[in-house]
Design a protein with these regions (language model features):
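Asp-based, Mg2+/Mn2+-dependent phosphohydrolase catalytic module
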Residues: 1-7, 92, 108-110, 114-215
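N-terminal helical cap/lid subdomain that shapes the substrate entry/recognition surface
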Residues: 2-97
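A generic structural signal for short
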Residues: 16-17, 78-79, 101, 133, ...
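Conserved SAM-binding loop
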Residues: 17, 83, 101-104, 137, ...
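Small/polar loops that bind or transfer phosphate-bearing groups
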Residues: 19-20, 47, 103-104, 163, ...
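Non-catalytic, surface-exposed connector residues within folded enzymatic/regulatory domains
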Residues: 45, 66, 81-84, 106, ...
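Short phosphate-binding/catalytic loops that engage adenosine nucleotides
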Residues: 97-99, 177
């Protein structure tokens, strides 16, 4: 870690900040069985990827894209957006210590508007919120996390990524940023080799632990 330079915490959203991945698994699992029965565990295959990438890759037909998007937006309107245990307090602790916080989500602005309605405090919790519209490539490409670090001209060794999905973990590691796997969506065993450190949730994590890992 380089002293006297910004420290940045880069958070994926679903499954890291918000406890929503199990709900998305239900939706995308049903979509996969309906439209792509030849792809087992479709919900796991697409986790962490932007909606645009998912549509272009698996639903090239424009009419089918509209149908899937309509079903998704209706589903998101009725989702519950609870916080992952401990994450709210952890983010507040980071702010108290001057750590820059960035949401790096594959979700689009339409989905995030549902989050803001459910949590009016969400926007002011973070220094920046990056959505799929900000990225030129979907996870597992590292572009999104490199962009998050660049916003504050932070050295990569001063940054930490928090991710739950395989694609997100690959993006963090490909960016050459210390990557913490959050075992909410996938088991500890399955993400251990893809992470630099693994936590179950944020009740067991703190600013001091983050600094210890970055030093």
């Amino acid at each position: 870690m380089i002293k006297d330079r910004p420290i940045v915490a880069l958070f994926d959203n679903d499954g890291v900040i918000l406890d929503t991945e199990s709900q998305y698994s239900i939706f995308w699992g049903a979509v996969g069985r309906k439209y792509h029965p030849e792809i087992p565990n479709f919900d796991h295959v697409i986790k962490g990827q932007t909606l645009v990438y998912i549509l272009d890759t698996y639903f090239p037909d424009k009419d089918l894209q509209k149908q899937v998007v309509g079903e998704l937006y209706e589903f998101e309107e009725n989702m519950e957006y609870g916080y992952i245990p401990g994450v709210y307090d952890f983010i507040q602790e980071l702010k108290e210590h001057g750590v820059k916080t960035v949401v790096v989500t594959s979700s689009d602005q339409s989905k995030m508007n549902h989050v803001y309605r459910s949590h009016p405090e969400f926007k002011v919790m973070f220094d920046r919120i990056l959505t799929s519209e900000d990225f030129k490539a979907s996870k597992p490409d590292p572009y999104c996390y490199l962009l998050g670090a660049k916003l504050f001209n932070a050295p990569l060794e001063n940054c930490m990524v928090f991710e739950d999905s395989f694609n997100g973990l690959k993006a963090g590691k490909a960016a050459d940023i210390f990557t913490v796997g959050v075992a909410t969506t996938n088991s500890r065993d399955s993400i251990e080799s893809k992470s630099d450190y693994v936590i179950d949730d944020f009740r067991e994590f703190s600013y001091s632990k983050m600094m210890d890992l970055l030093h």
